[in-house]
Structures are given as structure tokens and as C-alpha cells.
Swiss-Prot record:
Catalytic residues in the record: 326 (cysteine persulfide intermediate)
GO molecular function, one term: metal ion binding
GO CC aspect terms: L-cysteine desulfurase complex
Biochemical pathway: Cofactor biosynthesis; iron-sulfur cluster biosynthesis
Keyword Transcription regulation: no
UniProt protein name: Cysteine desulfurase IscS
Length: 403
């Protein structure tokens, strides 16, 4: 077993060797520009791009013509939300999203607010799922777009996309879904799902970083205002020379995901259950997010009376995160856990374990023993733990104000 043990697959995944192997020729001999229509170098590259587009479409049961290449899910979220909001703004300027969305959605919404759009940010229920009645109640005559992620990056809960999309359809609201964390983890069938726009990323699914895609429904046709101009690539929606090697990598990664997903999810579920069972007998341990409506890859746990930062320092041999990688550089408690109603203390003491393709039972057992040992040691030196063990209710303690 190599240290540190990587249990942070929701931050990024390694590129599958099969994916890397497929990419390499497009960095060396097959280096043509897919937009070069006058020679075989261009034709070869274009064929590779279209094959990859088909593989991405197949994983989510879409038409390849509905797949637009982008630089990743962040760009896809921006193109979908800004593109639709700006194109349809004569219909209305009200948007709906959820407080636990990824920053790529929340910051895009904030940006639109600064240009005159109005956004409703819904609170999730305590289990992290969206209250469908609250969602329905938030829709107004001028609501043009709603954005709800399929799988949450911090707590792994799966939203009821079919039901939310159904409500959007009833009210003529365009529905965008960030599915960066969903591909290869849950079945996605865009023939059936009432979804208009869906964002994908390669690097959460064992593909390379720097490449993603946006699904844009053709029937009924969804129109977007392009955010990137210059050459009219991707049917005018996203200009810029296509990164053939990245695209080939994403196609292969999504092909592998389609073929291996069912068996892989079962294996990961067993490992997640093993991890949960190993930590479940500890005192004052709380699971964040619904355990049923959840991908098997994610376990987000708060260890009460342990300071999150000191726990992270103590478990250096485990690559895990507290909060999302995009925001874990800040010392703020996770905004996702705060939105679930967790106290600052519990939000601060949370660890996100995310398992993946190369996680073994040995890795999980190592994580269990390391966490148990370090949490016990940190609690030994914690006055709060001592007070808790003495039966003092810390919520009723009157702390003296600092002078």
C-alpha cells in the first residue's frame, strides 16, 4: 500500500491508463486540427472528435449532436446558465437554484444578479435533498431557468432530477443540471429525463482535466447565447480549436464508465459500507446527507469535539478533504453543511471520504484505524470533550465574552 492513501475521488480522479494510452497518439502523430477540412491530418482528428462525441452521448442516452465540447463543467455551467438566461431574458429574469450547489453554479448566478437578474436560493432539507413543494412554490410567471445538481460534490446525495424536471416542464421553465459528479455513478437517460441542459466533466470520471461537455436539448430546442466567440466552432456555441487529445480521453473515459459502472458501483458500495461500519461505533459521529439517496462513493462524516483542521493535520497519510476542494483552501466551514443546518462546530469537524476505481479494502481498513486513533488522541486533549464526558451540556454553557 502506497502512502498517502487517496480517498478524495470527488476532488479529481486519476486518468485511467486505458484513457492515457488512447490520448497519446493525438499528441504526437495525429496532431491535426479537427477544423482543417482540406487534408487527412484534419480528417483523422475530426473523426476522433466525433467518435468521442458519440461515446459521451451514449453514456447519457443523448443524440451526439446535443453534445457541445467545453473546457470542463465550470465552463459548461457558465455557458448553460448565462447562455440561457441571456437568450430568454425577454421571457423573464428570475432564476432558481439551491444553496448547496457547486460554486460554478452559485457564482454564475451571483454574476447574473449583478446584471439585473433575480435569483431564489432554496434551502435543502436537513438530509440535503430538495423539498419539491418548496421548489414548486418558488416558481413565478417570470422564472426562466432552474439549476439543480444531480449529485452533490460534498455529501454525495442524489436529487430527484426526474421530479424536479417534471415540475419545470409543467411551468415552461428551462432546467439545467450539473452532472459533473454523476457520470459513471448513476444511470442517466436523457431520452427519458425532462432535462434541457446538463454539464459534464472528464476529470471526475477517470478522464483528463481541462475538458468537459454541455448537453443542449434539440427537441424541444434550447437556444443559448454563446459566451466564447471566434470561429464559430461547436455550431457557434463554443468557439476555439478543439483539444483533440483531451476530447479523445473524455470519450474513452465515458465509454469505460458505461461498460463498467454497474459492477464498479457494487464493489464501491461494499467498501463504503466497510468504512461506515468501521467508524460507526465511535461516539459523537454524524453522517452528513441522506444515506439512501446517495452515491456509494461518498461518506461525509462529522467528528464532534474534534477541530477539523487539527484532524486533517493528524491524518496526513490519508488524502481526504473537509469541504469541497474548490473551497477547502479557505478556513470557512463548509457552506453545504451549514445549509443542512449543521452547527459551525460540526461543519468544521467534517471529513469527506470519496472512494473510487483504485480504492482497496486495505486502504479502507487503514483509514478506519488511523481515524480512530487520531480522533481519540485529539479528544484526549480537548477540554470540550472532557466537559461532554462529564455530562455538561455545552449548548447551555455561558462562555465569558473575550475582552
Amino acid at each position: 500500500m502506497k502512502l498517502p492513501v487517496y480517498l478524495d475521488y470527488s476532488a479529481t480522479t486519476p486518468v485511467d491508463p486505458r484513457v492515457a494510452e488512447k490520448m497519446i497518439p493525438f499528441l504526437t502523430e495525429n496532431f491535426g486540427n479537427p477544423a482543417s477540412r482540406s487534408h487527412t491530418f484534419g480528417w483523422t482528428a475530426e473523426q476522433a472528435v466525433e467518435n468521442a462525441r458519440e461515446e459521451v452521448a451514449k453514456l447519457v442516452n443523448a443524440d451526439p449532436r446535443e453534445i457541445v465540447w467545453t473546457s470542463g463543467a465550470t465552463e459548461s455551467d457558465n455557458l448553460a446558465i448565462k447562455g440561457a438566461a441571456e437568450f430568454y431574458q425577454t421571457k423573464g429574469r428570475h432564476l432558481i437554484t439551491v444553496k448547496t450547489e457547486h460554486k460554478a453554479v452559485l457564482d454564475t448566478m451571483r454574476e447574473l444578479e449583478s446584471s439585473g437578474f433575480e435569483v431564489t436560493y432554496l434551502e435543502p432539507m436537513a438530509n440535503g435533498l430538495l423539498d419539491l413543494d418548496a421548489f414548486r412554490a418558488a416558481i413565478r410567471p417570470d422564472t426562466v431557468l432552474a439549476s439543480v445538481m444531480q449529485v452533490n460534490n460534498e455529501i454525495g446525495v442524489i436529487q430527484d432530477i426526474a421530479a424536479i424536471g417534471g415540475i419545470c416542464r409543467e411551468h415552461g421553465v428551462i432546467f439545467h443540471v450539473d452532472a459533473a459528479q454523476a457520470t459513471g455513478k448513476v444511470e442517466i437517460d436523457l431520452e427519458q429525463l425532462p432535462v434541457d441542459l446538463m454539464s459534464f466533466s472528464a476529470h471526475k470520471t477517470y478522464g483528463p482535466k481541462g475538458i468537459g461537455a454541455l448537453y443542449v436539448r434539440r427537441k424541444p430546442r434550447i437556444r443559448l447565447k454563446a459566451q466564447m466567440h471566434g470561429g464559430g466552432h461547436e455550431r457557434g456555441l463554443r468557439s476555439g480549436t478543439l483539444a483533440t487529445h483531451q476530447i479523445v480521453g473524455m470519450g474513452e473515459a465515458f465509454r469505460i464508465a458505461r461498460e463498467e459502472m454497474a459492477a464498479e458501483n457494487e464493489r464501491i458500495r461494499r467498501l463504503r459500507d466497510r468504512l461506515l461500519a468501521g467508524l460507526a461505533d465511535m461516539e459523537e459521529v454524524f453522517i452528513n446527507g441522506d444515506l439512501e439517496q446517495r452515491v456509494p462513493h461518498n461518506l461525509n462524516i462529522s467528528f464532534n469535539y474534534v477541530e477539523g483542521e487539527s484532524l486533517m493535520m493528524a491524518i496526513k497519510d490519508l488524502a481526504v478533504s473537509s469541504g469541497s476542494a474548490c473551497t477547502s483552501a479557505s478556513l470557512e466551514p463548509s457552506y453545504v453543511l451549514r445549509a443542512l443546518g449543521r452547527s459551525d462546530e460540526l461543519a468544521h469537524s467534517s471529513i469527506r471520504f470519496t472512494l473510487g476505481r483504485y480504492t482497496t479494502a486495505e486502504d479502507v481498513d487503514f483509514a478506519i484505524s488511523l481515524i480512530k486513533d487520531k480522533v481519540a488522541r485529539l479528544r484526549e486533549i480537548s477540554p470540550l470533550w472532557e466537559m461532554y464526558k462529564d455530562g455538561i451540556d455545552l449548548n447551555t454553557v455561558q462562555w465569558a465574552a473575550a475582552h
